[in-house]
Amino acid sequence: MQPVVETLSGLERRVDLAISVADVEKEVQAQLKRVARTAKVPGFRPGKAPMAMLERSHGPSVRYDVINSQVARAFEQAVEAAQLRVAGSPSLEPKTEGVDENTLAFSATFEVYPEVAVPDLSDLAVTRYETEVTDAEVDKTLDVLRKQRASYETREGRAAQDDDRIVLDFAGTIDGVPFEGGKAENFPFILGQGRMLPEFEEAARGLKAGDTKVFPLSFPEDYQGKEVAGKTAEFTITVKEVAEAVLPVVDAEFAKSLGQADADVEKLKADIRGNIEREVKVRSQGRTKTSVMDALVEAAKFDVPKSLVDNDVQGRIAQAREELKQRGVPNADSMPMPAEVFAVESERRVRLGLLVSELVKQQQLQAKPEQVRARIEEFAQNYEQPAQVVSYYLSDRQRRAEIEAIVLEDNVVAYVLEKAKVTDEKVPFDQLMGMA
């Protein structure tokens, strides 16, 4: 008789399972005989130990495995007969009431996948982001490259300004008491690069070699030095040297120093533009993808299995702990990480994943081999040896699968953009790159 599947609530189901004690014992004896051929029992040659002794030493573990195997088989048969897609693993509880001695009975509680209805994509409102790369962006990048290769010349009587290299002594106290890391001699830094706190840089700006200045400095609440975070210190600085940055001329020699094989300035600028355009494309597409995925998940109106959400939460907690360990945070494995902190985002990820999977299946948006190769080749252009990068990804199934997942998402985004209400938005370059 086919087991009856009971609907508890939402996606939760329950089914009663029964297996024969005789079938269990038959399988247990068969496995014990196989164990007997190789089991090492003191005082007996292999294969000669009495079955009663093997029953005592191996019987419980063999019986446990056999029962688990037969219950799992009964569960698979029950959900297959009911044509259910199980999400996660079932929770099993033994049943004794109304069960005869020849039967082992269990109650299996589990969740099923929801019926995923793809929303009407024409109702979605999404934004497609675009950013133009102009000569100004190329020139800014050239300036950054020049500053990275700057030399410095000491200027007597020069008032310190941005991009100058300053060498100074500093000493700080809090309530008159020195603190760790608050003192240094002949300390160099480039003014305006943000290496020092803004108040420190502002105090140094305009000073000349030989000048001394006393000023208050408030450490931010989230400052990395916990012993001074949120406190106000008094600093004394004495400038030893002010050196002006001397930038290299953009010429053939400069181009060659940056790896431009032909030492051609115009080719160097073209290379820079190409690199910027690739980065702009990645960031613009990333913003557009976020807009599309946000619209999809907002329109996804179906329940999600709690077991899948819980699995995602645990995965994210494990990932967070691993990241903390890599950053050298002590006791990362025992640090409290409440599941509810991750639950909302995990539910969103699961819901979006189910919807995207259904959309891919319905519209056949799977990544094609030629798309994967093209994406790898495009990505490889960011490296000095693109052919090696292409081979690196194509030769390994797991690495190739990573690119396939990206291409699949690209296919979904492209399909949604064809159907949805799209607003094109121009994003200023500095804003896109996080510089504004």
Curated annotation (Swiss-Prot):
Signal peptide: none annotated. It is an enzyme of class 5 (isomerase). Keywords: Cell cycle, Cell division, Chaperone, Cytoplasm, Isomerase, Rotamase. The gene is tig. Residues 163-248 form the PPIase FKBP-type domain. Belongs to the FKBP-type PPIase family. Tig subfamily. NCBIfam families: tig. Involved in protein export. Acts as a chaperone by maintaining the newly synthesized protein in an open conformation. Functions as a peptidyl-prolyl cis-trans isomerase. It is found in: Cytoplasm. Its EC number is 5.2.1.8. Consists of 3 domains; the N-terminus binds the ribosome, the middle domain has PPIase activity, while the C-terminus has intrinsic chaperone activity on its own. It comes from the Bacteria. GO terms for molecular function: peptidyl-prolyl cis-trans isomerase activity; protein folding chaperone; ribosome binding. PROSITE patterns: FKBP_PPIASE. Its main location: cytoplasm. It catalyses: [protein]-peptidylproline (omega=180) = [protein]-peptidylproline (omega=0). One of its GO terms (biological process) is protein unfolding. This is Trigger factor. GO terms for cellular component: cytoplasm.
